[in-house]
Amino acid sequence: MASPGFHRPSGRSQHVCMRITIRSHKKMRRYSILRSFFSLGLIACFCIFLIIVLSEEPNMRLLYKLSYGYVKILNNVKLLESIASCIRCGRITSVNDLNQFVFQSTAVFFTNKTD
């Protein structure tokens, strides 16, 4: 038996409760999609910030262009974030360091072709 304070909806009220539940699930799904777009927007803002910061330092322009080329090929935003953090902390200071880092991170070897 139901407890004294508990009211189980029946008939029309049960139908209304189901509609409310379906609406709340749709809202939750909508908010989940919005959260995904928001996080992608934050990543895009971070990438734009990196473009501005790294392009101001002349000796980092080549490294940035190479890392951006790798990321464009691999289509991987997380790799761009890790490359940028390694450039800032000083782990990547040359093109060879960048090649080695990308090779270790993705197990893909890129060779520099000279004309």
Swiss-Prot record:
One term under GO cellular component: membrane
Protein name: Putative uncharacterized membrane protein YER076W-A
Additional record remark: Partially overlaps YER076C.
Membrane topology: Single-pass membrane protein
Bilayer-crossing regions: 36-56
Location(s), subcellular: Membrane
Keywords: Membrane, Transmembrane, Transmembrane helix
Principal location class: membrane
